[in-house]
């Protein structure tokens, strides 16, 4: 019995590692998006407590720009919607990656089982 790993199994192992790295990258992106969404929700909550004629400032790059409450609320709601859509997309990608990972694991088990016989 040869201890050398067949090229097909090596290829499947490489694919499995790649899928695992993709899953880790997606998890990091998801955490970042969730954090950004939480911050935006908290900001919106605080904004809604202010009077309608309140002057607010919002960050634009390195600057703080004076704005009115309504414009800032609208921008935050738009940002929240965008973040929610991105999170949904990432969740779908995670599901696909998870299925692919399971599929590759099964293929590897079968390949290793037939190799050992």
UniProtKB/Swiss-Prot annotation:
A GO CC term assigned to this protein in UniProt: prefoldin complex
Subcellular location(s) of the protein: Cytoplasm
Keyword Cytoplasm tagged: yes
CDD domains: Prefoldin_beta_GimC
A GO biological-process term: protein folding
One Gene Ontology molecular-function label: protein-folding chaperone binding
Keywords from the named record: Chaperone, Cytoplasm
Primary subcellular site in the record, as a coarse category: cytoplasm
Short name of one Pfam family: Prefoldin_2
HAMAP family given in the database record: PfdB (MF_00307)
Subunit structure: Heterohexamer of two alpha and four beta subunits.
Cited function: Molecular chaperone capable of stabilizing a range of proteins. Seems to fulfill an ATP-independent, HSP70-like function in archaeal de novo protein folding.
Family to which the UniProt record says this protein belongs: Belongs to the prefoldin subunit beta family.
Name the UniProt record assigns to this protein: Prefoldin subunit beta
Naturally occurring in which organism (per UniProt): Methanococcoides burtonii (strain DSM 6242 / NBRC 107633 / OCM 468 / ACE-M)
Gene for this chain: pfdB
């Amino acid at each position: 019995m040869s201890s050398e790993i067949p090229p097909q199994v090596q290829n499947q192992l490489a694919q499995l590692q790649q899928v695992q790295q993709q899953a880790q990258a997606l998890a990091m992106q998801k955490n970042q998006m969730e954090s950004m969404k939480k911050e935006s929700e908290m900001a919106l909550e605080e904004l809604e407590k202010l009077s309608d004629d309140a002057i607010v400032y919002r960050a634009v790059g390195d600057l703080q720009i004076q704005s009115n409450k309504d414009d800032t609320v609208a921008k935050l709601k738009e940002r929240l919607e965008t973040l929610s859509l991105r999170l949904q997309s990432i969740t779908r990608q995670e599901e696909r990656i998870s299925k692919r990972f399971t599929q590759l694991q099964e293929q590897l088990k079968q390949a290793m089982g037939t190799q050992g016989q």
